[in-house]
């Protein structure tokens, strides 16, 4: 069930990302995600089969930049998964997760920005009214024009006022 929810969330990001365009330079502002239509479902499957990371407990939230198939294999770590061909000469995959203390938290937006050559992934988490107390995580990812620099993660929580 958890995998199904994660896949649905990523599918929503893919659909949102499909209206994006290519052509971002290293200027200050928002970095637009790229959609690779023929590989999206394989990428979703691969990025949600991540087996080399311990995403349980009180781990910090993380963000990774993948610039090669080797990077992608290190993250996925499962030889039974089909890894799509991604042109890593042109693109990078940004993958991350945010640890949340409640199952009702929903990833409401993500935005990669660059300022003075420094990249930041801004993730907004919305706390819905339903759910229960449990340490869990919310996964996010996107395909972007080539990124060589590390990315810092900024997480904002939006709470429902009752």
Question: How would you describe each model-predicted region?
Answer:
Residues 17-19, 64, 150-151:
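N-terminal processing/targeting junctions
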Residues 101-162:
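Extracytoplasmic electrostatic interaction patches
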Residues 8, 73, 151-154:
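A broad, structure-centric signal for solvent-exposed, well-ordered loop/edge residues
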Residues 25-86:
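N-terminal catalytic cores of peptidoglycan-degrading enzymes
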Residues 62-120:
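Mature extracytoplasmic domains of secretory-pathway proteins
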Residues 9-19:
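Bacterial N-terminal signal peptides
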Residues 1-8, 148:
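Short, Lys/Arg-enriched, disordered terminal segments
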Residues 2-4, 17-44, 156-162:
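Bacterial Sec-dependent N-terminal signal peptides
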């Amino acid at each position: 069930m958890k995998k199904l929810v994660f896949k649905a969330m990523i599918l929503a990001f893919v659909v949102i990302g499909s209206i994006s365009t290519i052509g971002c330079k290293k200027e200050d502002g928002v970095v637009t995600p790229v959609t690779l239509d023929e590989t999206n479902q394989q990428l979703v499957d691969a990025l949600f089969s991540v087996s080399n990371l311990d995403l349980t407990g009180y781990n910090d939230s993380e963000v990774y930049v993948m610039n090669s198939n080797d990077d992608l294999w290190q993250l996925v770590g499962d030889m039974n998964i089909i890894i799509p061909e991604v042109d890593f000469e042109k693109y990078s995959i940004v993958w991350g997760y945010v640890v949340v203390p409640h199952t009702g938290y929903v990833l409401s937006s993500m935005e990669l920005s660059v300022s003075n050559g420094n990249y930041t992934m801004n993730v907004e988490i919305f706390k819905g009214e339903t759910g229960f107390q449990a340490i869990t995580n919310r996964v996010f990812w996107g395909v972007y024009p080539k990124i060589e620099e590390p990315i810092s993660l900024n997480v904002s929580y939006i709470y429902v006022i009752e």
